[in-house]
């Protein structure tokens, strides 16, 4: 602890911007480096979000809901309306997955409410010198989540609409089915897919 007090402001910032990682990152996004703190806190917040949603479902009553049940029901209604406007088929997997990802990301961002020095100081007691507890501050983590959501949306787009329906929508929406409009429709739909997920 005495050596931490001797850090300059630049050293302090560099210490707090360094992940507990398997190696040194060569670029801002480097998938060959594993950031252990990002993985640990992401999985921890996923378990907490699943536990919270399970607890809300288990304790739900048909009578007057409590504050927690009301908040979860509002989230469920919001996600259901969003999924209804986007997916016009079977939403039995998509809506719960979207709810889980939403709560998970909110909880990962909520870690930022914990004082910045508290968790690294606790980890330092156990010999962990670098700890960056906010998973969404790691571009590898956020890119991983967005790529997974993009792949899920493409998969379920194919599954619900079929290959023919998906490609027809890719080239004919929103400007029409004329062959001169196909490049514009395709470009706009690709931008839309990337904007929704990445």
List where the protein language model places each region.
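Selective transmembrane helix interface/packing segments
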Residues: 1-198
